[in-house]
Every structure is written in C-alpha cells, then in structure tokens.
Regions:
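Short, conserved secondary-structure transition motifs
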Residues: 155-161, 251-265, 371-380, 574, ...
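Proteolytic maturation boundary segments
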Residues: 12-45, 224-264, 306, 404-513, ...
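Bacterial N-terminal signal peptides that target proteins for export
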Residues: 1-12
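Histidine-acidic residue clusters that define the catalytic metal-binding segment
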Residues: 27-35, 157, 175-215, 243, ...
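M16 family metallopeptidases and their MPP-like homologs
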Residues: 47, 51-78, 92-136, 166-192, ...
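Non-catalytic, conformational "gating/processing" segments within enzyme and secreted inhibitor domains
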Residues: 151, 171, 200-235, 429-431, ...
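Extracellular/periplasmic catalytic domains that process cell-envelope and extracellular macromolecules
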Residues: 29, 37-39, 50-53, 110, ...
Length: 899
C-alpha cells in the first residue's frame, strides 16, 4: 500500500539520520547472486547489498531491435515509451507519481538485444516497484490516442538525430556493415517504419515478447532475500507465461571484402567511422577484445590518442565495443582536425592498427588495461544500480554467472591474445569505412568529452553504448547527499577540505573546484580560463603531459581538471591504495604547471576547433545567445566559457602564466573527498600534499547584479542542415540564499523541474506530442539564478510549443498548486536524499555544491525540514514573484524555412 506523502517525507528524514553512521561503517561485502525461477518462467536474480538503505529493480525483456521484423523497426523503442503510459490499473502519469511519492527515480532504455526498465528507491519502498513492474508486464493499455501522441514524441526524438552529422554517418555506416542482420537498423527505427506503426502491430509485438518467460527481474540492494522473493511471488507468480517469442533467424552472410560509404551534408567538420566485424558474446576472444579496446582508446595515454589526437590529426576519438547476442562490431569514431586531408587521418588509423597486428602490445600497456578494468569494476559495483545493470546485461547476453568471473577472465588475457585478435579481426577486408564530408554551411556535431580529445570510458562488459534511447532523458546526478563522519576543515593556507567516510567500495572520489573559471577572464581574453584549465595537466616542472596521463591511467584512476562557467572543476576517482598518488598528481598540476609552448600552441588550436564545432551545435548556440541576452557585455556571465574566436587567437603563453599565478591559489580552492578512509586520514593526506602551497590573497572584484529583464523580441538563429528547433526561454530568477528559494524550487519542480510528470511535460509531450523533453530550472550560478525553459521541437511547432509553455506558466501563477502536487514534489526531492547516498562520486558532487553555494555542511540534515515548511500558497506566491512569462528572452535556433 502507498502511504500518504507527508508520512513518507517524515520517514525519509529519519532514514537520512539513521543512514549517517550506516554509511560511515558500511561495507561493500555482499551475498552471491541467487537465481530463482517461478513456475511461469520468470527468472529472478537477487543480490543483497547493505551499504545504503536503497534497492534497485531492473526488469529486462529479450525484446530489442534484433527482434524486429522488416518494416517494424523502432517498435521495441515505441513500446518502451508506451509502458510509461496507462495500464489497465493505472492512468497515464500514475507510474511517475508512485515513484516520486516513494522518493525514487526510474527510467528505461532500448538496446539492440533487450529492453530494460529500472526503478531505484528507498529499500522500504520495494513493493511499489514490484507493483508497477508486474502491472505493466502484461497490462499496458496501449490507448490509441496515447500511442498517436507518443509516436509524435518518438518522431521528434528521431528528427533530433538529424541535427548531428555523426548520427547520420553512423546509421549509414552500420547499414553498410550489416547487409541482412537487424543490427543494421536504428534502435529508434527508420522514420517511415515508425510512422506506419499501428496499435494492432504494437499490441501483437507486446503480447509476443512481454511475458514472464521472456523476462528477467534483477533486484539488488538493502533487501532480505526470502522476504523479497515472497513479494515477487505475490506480484508476479500469478501472471501467465506464454509461448516462446519468435526466434531471430536472420544471420549475416559472410563478408566478401571492405565496404565504404560517404555521407555529404552541411557543415565544416569531417568525421570518420570504421566498423570491424566482431564476435558474439560468449566467444573466447571477447575479453581480449575488451582489453584491446582499453589499450587503443581509453584515456590520453592510449595508443590511438597519442597517434591521432596528439599529432593534430583528430580532434576527438572514441570506440564502441560491447557484448552483443549475435556477431557485432568494434567501431572507431574520429573527428577530423580542420585542414587535415581525409586520407591522412584514415591512413594514420590504419597504420596504428597495423602496428599492433605486426608488433603486438607491451606488457605495460596490457597491465594498464587490466588495472583500468579492475578499478572500473570496483567503482561501478559501488552502487546498487551499477551492480544490477551489470548483472542484467550479462544475463541478456552470456548469462549472469559471468558476473563473478569477469576480472579473472581479464587477468588471463595475454599480449599474444591481443596480437592474435588484432590480426584476426582488424584486417582491411573485415572493415566498413564511413566518411561524413562537409559541404559548407553548418551542422552540429557531438562534442568531445575532454579537451584533449579522448575520455576514460567504461569497459565493454559494463557499457551500454546501445542504450541511447530512453523514455525520459536523464537530468544528471543526484540533487542532495548525506553521509556520516563528515568534517569541514580549512588549512592554514586557506584551502577548504570536506572529507566524508563512505565505504560502499574500496575506492575514493574527489570533487572540487578553484575559483578560476571563465567569469574571471580579462577583457579581450575570453577563453583564457578555459585554456589555462586545459593546460595545467599538460606538463609540469618534472613531468610531460604524456607522463602525467600515463602515471594516472596506469593505475586505473581517472582525473580531470576542466573549466566550468564559474569555476575550474576538479574530478578524480581511484582505488583506495592509489589515493596518495592521485592526490599528489592533482597538487602537482594545480600548483606547478609548466605550460610548455608546444602544448599551448596545440591547446589554442584545439580550442579553436571546439569553437567551430560549438558554432554548428544548435544547443550550444542557444545557450550562448541566451546568456548574451540575459546579461550585459560588462557582466562576467555575458561571455561564453569557450570564448570568442578573435580573443582566443590573441592568447599567449604569458597570458596563461599570469592568469594561473593570479587565480590558482589555496584560498580559492575547495576539495571534497569521499570514500574508503576516515576523515582524519583524508585530512592528514591533504595537509601533507597541499599544506605548503603558499596563498596569493587576490580577491575577485564584486559581481554586478543581474539586470531586470523586460519583454524582449524573439531572437531566431537559422542553422542550415538541421531538422529540429532548439528553444530556450530565460528571465530573472532567485538567489540560492533567498528565504523563498525552497518555495520557488518546489513550484518550478512541479512546473518543469522533475521528469515525466511535470506540468510542462504533460502539456507538451504527453498531451501535445510536440517534444521529446521540456525542462525548466533555476540555472545554478553564483548570485541570482536565471530561470530557464529549454525544449526541442519541430520548426513548424515552435510557436505552438512556446505558447503552450507560457500558458502552463500562467496557469500555475494564476490558479496555484494543489496540495497533492506539492507533496509529490516534496517527496521526490526528499527521496533523492537517500538515493544520492548510493555512490561516492554522487555524494562528493553534492557536498561540493553545498560549499560552492554556501549552504553549510549540515544542509542535507536541514533539507527535509526546509521543504516541509513550504505551503501551496507560498509556492504559488514564489512563482508569481520569481517566474514572469511576460519578461522572458526567447531564443530559437532552427533550420531555414523551406522556400
């Protein structure tokens, strides 16, 4: 039974208080996976993890795009969307409401081999998740009107892909790599197929594939196994099994040689994708492939990063290899550097792969890749969601029994295995080569994750590269956090440390910042802060950029120092035994960068390339224009963090040195360390490493207030080669320390700050079918937080979408908020308090923000009471005071109107 919201809010507050010591003394030790099969064929996999009072429930169906017949592509993904709609027992929105009232979060995704639904919530609310999943397993209503609306949402999502040339290239390259097998198709489906889907076809597919004997239920977390299985039998035991679903009979014919495809379109950036044939999950070569993937592309010290990015041939690179039910692919994705001839980049990739085929890899490269897997597994398994995701993915491909064997299998891989696999699979006759050739104009690319072009990625048996299509796009990390054994300590030199013990895994997480972000850029030097942050890791007095990257990546640790709008963000994660090394690495980079001239030259060139790509990205253009119109040129938030091209071109090494000397100092630095050490041990390590860093005492000038926004004409920017419009509305907001902040926060959460059940989502997505997602938020900056609405829609629906959004804002301001809405929003926010304790990095993220925004270290304890104090009348009053639909800047980035 679902309790009343106010009762649960009190329960969450108690749960947080009780969780303080539990987290401090918790252990990552856990029971083995237990397999139970019900008489109806439902397989249930349970695993107890008692480090936090959280449970996650994953329901996986063997129904992915590989199961779709010709002409029916995308039906798995459409059905995934419909399972968030009405059932015979629940109306549309009820699933989202129940999860929110339980203080949980939920989502789903469709992959090539399966579809997964997941709900994570406080463990005392497990029954809610089971009730939802058992109901929608067989009882989805598939209402014709709801299906029509949801098809519009999916088509909007599909059209959004056309804004990205990498997506366009990938669909053509994959369709060329596979001639017959369903892996050639888009998970989201081909447009004509999606448009032709009917209720009858979706219902037939649902009844054939969604049944207990074609599903797996994975439950991981703070549970008692026997009691949990009793609940599972109660909710699922009476569901009837069905006949086996139709088997996938299509097999890809043997390849007869290399294949090529070229896609042409608007833009200024070229992209290269190379797909090699790869074996199915369970093949003896799988783990050698996984290790080779790490050697080639995992981090700045990887083979291909050094061969292609450091030589200025590629601006970015990544790879895609994962376990798949049938023979699949190993793909490389490269963004060409401006001015590089296409053949030069392709030849360089071929030569790098040929070198491994002929010479093999070194013992150090092999050990580094194994170390990375060990570290990734440790950190991934530090959350119940990570464990459940891994178990579910393995069960869908090779069997969950592999869960406890992964690391041993990886350790058994030899250098000879790596060379044999490269020789076997990376030959020229086994590849499909795709090029996107720009023809002028603009089009938006997928931006690289890291400034140096390569990013740390999860190993192939953990990653879900196929899982890009979900019912509700993720809105980022946890909102709040709590922990026991937490201290705040200011070193004599002014550096602030927040240390928290959290032993959910044998690892630690670091989040932090230096008050040296782009808001500190001097006039005429926009981009200087971003460039400086990029360069602090590119060489010190004692180590080169390659040596710095190699030292950290060999341990399997991750470390980054990246410019954000307000600050320079610090992020690191490592196994417990490597904490001191990683801390020393961060100290060396922050305190003593050498800024080698050659690295400065390369970084300036890479920042220019990033500016070029951002100028072609509709979302980046919209953000830049919005802030340029919300703040005057004299305000530090007016300028974009990446800078202007002419300013970047003028930056010299001397500018970088001066900026670093002025703004990188201990009294401007905050470190948050959470993990498998006591706060006292963490403090001692930080004092040893940073204690002798001399302070600079250079205060920042006071920031001018945000000006009042009056009604402004719509600003429309056209970008050729696009298919969808990006809309951003923005106006004045509220400061974080305002006593009315929580009332405004809850009003916004009801309007558009949650997930599927907000008023804006209901009006524009569920009822209107105008967008895949629409969100509102108070943008988290220091000082007044602008209020923003963002959405993607078809160019022809821009006026209707904006009018609908404004109408919903007016309705909230004029008619108020119901007590039920307020309690749902409050319960959802309070529930995130528990869920944020799920892993170390999430906790560190929140504790960092409590310091940045001056909330106080006791913020997690005060948060429940602060929310409970808000009444519906106060929330409405806050909306009337801080959200003004008639005083919004309107930015629209859209394709040109057809002639």
């Amino acid at each position: 039974m679902i309790s009343r919201p106010w009762q649960f809010a009190v329960g969450v507050a108690c749960c947080v208080a009780l969780a303080f010591p539990a987290l401090g003394n918790g252990s990552s030790d856990a029971s083995p996976i237990r397999e139970t099969v019900l008489p109806n064929g439902l397989k249930v996999l349970t695993k107890e993890l008692h480090a936090a009072p959280v449970v996650t429930v994953w329901t996986l169906y063997r129904a992915g795009s590989r199961n779709e017949r010709p002409g029916m592509t995308g039906i798995s993904h459409v059905l995934e969307h419909m399972l968030f709609r009405s059932t015979k027992a629940m109306k549309t929105g009820e699933i989202d409401r129940l999860v929110q009232l339980s203080g949980g979060r939920h989502n789903a995704y469709t992959s090539y081999d399966y579809t997964a639904y997941h709900i994570t919530l406080p463990s005392e609310r497990l029954e809610t998740a089971l009730r939802i999943e058992s109901d929608r397993m067989l009882n989805c209503a598939l209402d014709p009107d709801e299906l029509k609306t949801e098809l519009g949402v999916v088509l909007s999502e599909l059209q959004g892909r056309l804004n990205d040339p990498e997506e366009l290239l990938e669909e053509s390259t994959r369709a060329t790599a596979f001639l017959m097998h369903p892996y050639r198709n888009l998970i989201i489906g081909w447009k004509a197929d999606v448009q032709s889907l009917t209720r009858e076809s979706v219902l037939e597919y649902y009844q054939a594939h969604y049944q207990p004997n074609n599903a797996v239920l994975v439950i991981v977390g703070d549970i008692q196994t026997e009691a949990t299985l009793d609940l599972v039998r109660q909710y699922f035991g009476g569901l009837p099994g069905g006949p086996p679903p139709p088997p996938v009979l299509t097999r890809e014919p043997a390849r007869m040689g290399e294949r090529r495809v070229t896609v042409k379109g608007s833009g200024s950036t070229a992209y290269l994708q190379v797909f090699f044939d790869a074996p199915a999950a369970g093949h003896p070569d799988h783990y050698a492939f996984a290790v080779l993937d790490g050697i080639l592309t995992n981090g700045n010290s990887s083979r291909l990063h050094k061969a292609l990015v450091e030589t200025d041939l590629a601006a970015a690179l990544s790879s895609d290899y994962a376990m798949r039910k049938d023979p699949g692919w190993f793909a490389f994705y490269l963004t060409a550097r401006a001015g590089v001839p296409h053949q030069h980049l392709e030849d360089a990739l071929t030569q790098a792969l040929e070198r491994i085929r002929k010479e093999g890899v070194t013992d150090r490269e092999l050990q580094k890749a194994i170390n990375q897997v060990r570290a990734d597994l440790t950190m991934e398994y530090g959350s119940v969601s990570g464990v459940a995701r891994a178990i579910g993915k393995l069960e869908m491909t090779v069997g969950h029994q592999e869960f406890d064997r992964v690391l041993d299998r990886i350790r058994q891989v030899t250098a000879a295995d790596i060379q044999r696999v490269a020789r076997t699979y990376f030959g020229p006759d086994s590849r499909t080569v795709g090029w996107f050739v720009p023809e002028g104009g603009t089009t938006g690319p997928r931006l690289p994750t890291g400034g140096r072009g390569s990013a740390h990625h999860r190993p192939a048996f953990l990653a879900d590269p196929d899982a890009g299509s979900g019912a509700s796009p993720s809105q980022g990390g946890p909102t709040v956090a709590a922990t026991g054994k937490v201290i705040r300590h200011v070193l004599p030199n002014g550096l602030t440390l927040i240390a928290a013990e959290n032993r959910v895994a044998k690892s630690l997480a670091i989040k932090g910042y230096v008050l040296a972000g782009p808001v500190q850029d001097p006039p005429g030097k926009s981009g200087l802060a971003t460039l400086t942050a990029e360069l602090v890791t590119r060489g010190t007095a004692t180590q080169t950029a390659d040596e710095l990257a190699e030292r950290i990546e060999f341990l399997g640790a991750t470390s980054s120092i990246r410019s954000e709008r307000e600050t320079v963000g610090i992020t690191a994660q490592m196994l417990t035994e490597h904490f001191d090394v990683v801390l020393g690495h961060l100290a060396e980079c922050l305190r003593a960068p050498a800024f080698p001239p050659d690295e400065v030259r390369k970084a300036v060139g890479q920042l220019r390339s990033r500016l070029d790509r951002e100028a072609e990205d509709p979302k980046a253009v919209a953000r830049r224009e919005l802030f340029a119109h919300l703040f005057p040129p004299s305000h530090p938030l007016h300028r974009d963090p990446t800078g202007r091209r002419e300013d970047v071109d003028s930056i010299t090494r001397e500018d970088v040195v001066r900026f670093h000397t002025r703004f990188y100092s201990p009294e401007r630095t905050v470190l948050v360390v959470v993990g498998d050490r006591t706060p006292e041990e963490i403090r001692a390590a930080v004092e040893r490493t940073f204690g002798d860093w001399p302070p600079q005492a250079v205060p920042s000038p006071p920031r001018p207030p945000m000006p009042g926004i009056a009604s402004a004409p719509r600003r429309t920017i056209t970008l050729p080669g696009k298919s969808e419009a990006i809309v951003m509305l923005g106006g004045n907001g509220i400061t974080r320390d305002n006593p009315e902040y929580y009332a405004a926060f809850l009003a916004n959460r009801i309007l558009g700050g949650g997930e599927l059940n907000t008023r804006l989502m209901k009006a524009l997505r569920q009822d209107g079918g105008m967008t895949y997602g629409v969100y509102s938020y108070f943008h988290p900056v220091l000082g007044e937080r602008p209020w923003v609405v963002s959405l993607q829609t078809g160019p022809a629906m821009v006026d209707r979408a904006i009018a609908t959004a404004v109408a919903e804002i007016d309705r909230l301001r004029d008619r108020g908020i119901t007590a039920e809405e307020l309690e749902e929003a409050r319960a959802a926010a309070l529930g995130s308090l528990v869920l944020s304790m799920e892993d170390q990095m999430g906790m560190a993220f929140v504790l960092r923000d409590t310091e940045l925004f001056g909330l106080g270290i006791d913020f997690p304890v005060r948060f429940p009471a602060d929310l409970r104090s808000v009444t519906p009348a106060q929330a409405q009053a806050a909306a009337q005071k801080y959200i003004h639909p008639d005083r919004l800047v309107q930015i629209v980035v859209t394709p040109p109107q057809p002639r």
